């Protein structure tokens, strides 16, 4: 979820205007795919579906040279000089694991709504949940800084099913499959209808409202491309190189006095997930929209990403 100027996007149920435009042929195609995957899972269990996803990912890795090269270039761009110093994992191995991890996550995403709620939640291990709950207890909402690592579409569903009021940011040009699956989720899980989603190119008034109403707002600040000179950024050090990350949403959180945390989602074997919450990036009792505090928080955000990417290079989202 990459965002900087955000707001006034309607909740998912209202956003159904775009989803309603899906053609009947497109819907039929998605129904057939979902039916096949669910039938496979019923016959061979979720473990069987996971093995199918790994085989599918391996095949993609073998034949999709363009995407494989793009992922490897992304890794080189992220690690920079650290590659030459041998401070990062084997790129070839990370690329293969990325293809297999991503395909498995996508397969589960397609049939999540068909699984019993209890079965889903049993597959989630929440690390440092007490940090998030303590931040929410301050009644100022919570801003969770995300990054382009891991499957955020899985994360927001898990958080909603765990009972949290969550909000996020999405691109206006979402794919047809994502919109179709979103419809199915909203039909099955009432919690999904309470998720607030905003577009990434609109005015941020609603973000202030999210914090006032005690929501958990998550956006990613580590955008990989220039989104306009008018957007505020901060320069941070990451693997010995300078990176420019967006700062707008964090500044809004600072102005609202909302605790600022950082989160990651890690996909494990056989469709198990780890939700990881890091310590606050800013002392909640000293929050203020001051340049020094903002810069310190952004550098800590970058340091946490570097630590996470070094440990889970296959979780880079873009490939």
Please give the residue ranges for each predicted region.
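Active-site glycine-rich loop that binds ribose-phosphate moieties when present
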Residues: 127-128, 198-202
């Amino acid at each position: 979820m990459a965002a900087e100027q955000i707001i006034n996007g309607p909740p998912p149920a209202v956003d159904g205007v775009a989803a309603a435009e899906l053609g009947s042929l497109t819907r039929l195609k998605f129904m057939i795919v979902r039916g096949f995957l669910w039938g496979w899972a019923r016959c061979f269990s979720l473990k069987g579906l996971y093995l199918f996803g790994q085989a599918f990912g391996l095949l993609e890795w073998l034949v999709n040279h363009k995407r494989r090269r793009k992922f490897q270039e992304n890794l080189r761009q992220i690690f920079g000089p650290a590659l030459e110093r041998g401070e990062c994992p084997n790129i070839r191995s990370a690329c293969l694991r990325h293809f297999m991890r991503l395909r498995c996550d996508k397969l589960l995403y397609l049939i999540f709504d068909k699984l019993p709620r209890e079965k889903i939640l049993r597959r989630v291990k929440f690390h440092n949940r007490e940090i998030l709950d303590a931040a929410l207890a301050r009644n100022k909402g919570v801003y969770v800084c995300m990054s382009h690592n891991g499957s955020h579409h899985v994360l927001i569903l898990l958080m909603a099913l765990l009972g949290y009021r969550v909000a996020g940011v999405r691109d206006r040009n979402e794919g047809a499959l994502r919109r179709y699956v979103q419809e199915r989720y909203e039909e099955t899980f009432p919690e999904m209808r309470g998720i607030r989603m905003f577009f990434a190119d609109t005015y941020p008034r609603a973000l202030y409202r999210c914090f006032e109403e005690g929501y958990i707002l998550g956006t990613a600040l580590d955008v990989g491309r220039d989104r306009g000179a008018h957007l505020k950024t901060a320069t941070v050090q990451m693997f010995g190189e300078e990176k420019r990350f967006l700062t707008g949403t964090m500044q809004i959180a600072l102005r609202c006095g909302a605790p600022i945390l950082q989160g990651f989602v890690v996909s494990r074997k056989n469709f198990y997930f780890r939700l990881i919450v890091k310590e606050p990036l800013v002392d909640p009792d000293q929050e203020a929209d001051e340049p020094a505090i903002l810069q310190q928080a952004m550098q800590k955000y970058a340091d946490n990403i570097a630590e996470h990417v070094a440990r889970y290079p296959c979780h880079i989202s873009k490939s």
